[in-house]
């Protein structure tokens, strides 16, 4: 299965039990910042934004004082899982990033999608990739 298929069929799909509700944007990005696959709506990000995200996975709490920036959008960092998941909030939307062995799985959402739904979609795919050694 291609990386783009994972984004299209597992991240940008309807959320279980909520037909028509889906993430706003999604991507799979290598630890080096190279995009493996992305939705058409995923923001163009700067290398320093990806560096900050990778630093936070290695040094949890790094982004808390400044916020998480992606594509020029600032998210307030909220509770996540140290070294495994970063979650951010901005207004009625937010972001979930799950770290796997080789990549980061991104999901960005706006209402009516809830933070919990975004977490479920992103973390399920990330956990699957971890189980596969990816």
Curated annotation (Swiss-Prot):
Compartments, as annotated in UniProt: Cytoplasm, Cytoskeleton
Stored Pfam families: Profilin (PF00235)
Residues modified to Phosphothreonine: 114
CDD domains per the UniProt record, alphabetical: PROF (cd00148)
Keywords: Actin-binding, Allergen, Cytoplasm, Cytoskeleton, Disulfide bond, Phosphoprotein
Disulphides: 13-118
Molecular functions (GO terms): actin monomer binding
Keyword Phosphoprotein attached: yes
Protein origin, superkingdom: Eukaryota
Keyword Phosphoprotein in record: yes
Involved in PIP2 interaction (motif): residue ranges: 84-100
Chief localisation class: cytoplasm
Description of post-translational modifications: Phosphorylated by MAP kinases.
Stored SUPFAM superfamilies: Profilin (actin-binding protein) (SSF55770)
GO cellular component, one term: cell cortex
InterPro entries: PFN, PFN_euk, PFN_sf, Profilin_CS
Note: The variability of the residues taking part of IgE-binding epitopes might be responsible of the difference in cross-reactivity among olive pollen cultivars, and between distantly related pollen species, leading to a variable range of allergy reactions among atopic patients.
Subunit composition and interactions: Occurs in many kinds of cells as a complex with monomeric actin in a 1:1 ratio.
The family this protein is said to belong to: Belongs to the profilin family.
Function field: Binds to actin and affects the structure of the cytoskeleton. At high concentrations, profilin prevents the polymerization of actin, whereas it enhances it at low concentrations.
Name assigned to this protein: Profilin-3
């Amino acid at each position: 299965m291609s990386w783009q298929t994972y984004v299209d069929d597992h991240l940008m799909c309807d959320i279980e039990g909520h037909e028509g509700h889906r993430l706003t944007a999604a991507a799979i990005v290598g630890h080096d910042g190279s995009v493996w696959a992305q939705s058409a709506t995923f923001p163009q990000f700067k290398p320093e934004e990806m560096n900050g995200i990778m630093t936070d996975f290695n040094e949890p709490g790094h982004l808390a004082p400044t916020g998480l920036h992606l594509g020029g959008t600032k998210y307030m960092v909220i509770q996540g899982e140290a070294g495994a998941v970063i979650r951010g909030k901005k207004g009625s939307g937010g972001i979930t990033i799950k770290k796997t062995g080789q990549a980061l799985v991104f999901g960005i959402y706006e209402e009516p999608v809830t933070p919990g739904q975004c977490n479920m979609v992103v973390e399920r795919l990330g956990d699957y990739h971890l189980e596969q050694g990816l």
